[in-house]
Amino acid sequence: TSLKSTIGNYSARSNTAINLEMKWGVALLDPTFQPITQKLKNKGKVEATFANRPVSYANTNTLKTILMMTDSVNVDTVRIANRYYDSASERVHWNRNALDRYLYYNVRSWQRYRWYYTKYTANQANSMLGSICSATKDKGIVIWSVGFEVTDAAANVMRSCASSPSHFFRVEGVEISEAFKSIASQINQLRLIQ
């Protein structure tokens, strides 16, 4: 399908920012995103049935869920130093090249630190994720989380974000398929009950 093709064309850039993953997931379910959905419908990017979505949190006919998955742990998030990102050609360059790969192959190791700065640390990212997860649960959104071959530290972060301990799956290898089947089954049961 077109979606699978688009996803297949993505490539890993660098680092893990689970907090940003969650932030985007929540934004896409928030009613304030509705004007964007409307514009996408007007441009023919989404079907007309999506024009009035995301619906209000008060809508009792809708179950809002997020499935958050990682195979890593939050790490320090770095940004390219402004002096290397201040022209159109430089922005095009960085859209095509991952910073870590570029530095590894083109910049001597003792000079690399001058090319970037730390936006926030892994601990700050975990704190931001915790805040996002709490606010999301307060809105009644159900959070499922999957930690694929993660460390104990990452498992703890993912577990605390999930709506409950039973909404967290720590999996290895092919167990991931069973986790997704279980989540889908439970979501369908919730829909039938409500």
Give, region by region, the residue ranges found by the protein language model.
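P/S/T/G-enriched low-complexity
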Residues: T1-Q194
